[in-house]
Amino acid sequence: TLRVLEKVVPFEIKRVYFIHCSEGTERGGHRHKSTTQALICINGSCVISNHDGNKKEDFLLDSSSKCLILNPEDWHIMHKFNNNATLLVLASTLYDVNDYI
């Protein structure tokens, strides 16, 4: 299956990385000052718990056809990874430790 992302992602991609976790692992627990991210689970599944300041929502990413956009103000936790889960993250900025809150 071929997935084309350039019309889905609403920003210029500056950084790409993968998160590969074992079951029971939790990642995130922060938000960013200026980075927007696109999350795609390219293998397996995981849940993204997101709080935008007004409401909390859980998103199941279980297909490479699903892309979740996280804005800088979104507090997020990535969890409930199944054993083969690989999460692709596309970011609007280069890595900067000072961008994390």
What name fits each language-model region?
Residues 1-66, 84-86, 90, 96-99:
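Non-catalytic, conserved peripheral segments adjacent to functional cores
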Residues 61-81:
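Conserved metal-binding segment of the jelly-roll/cupin
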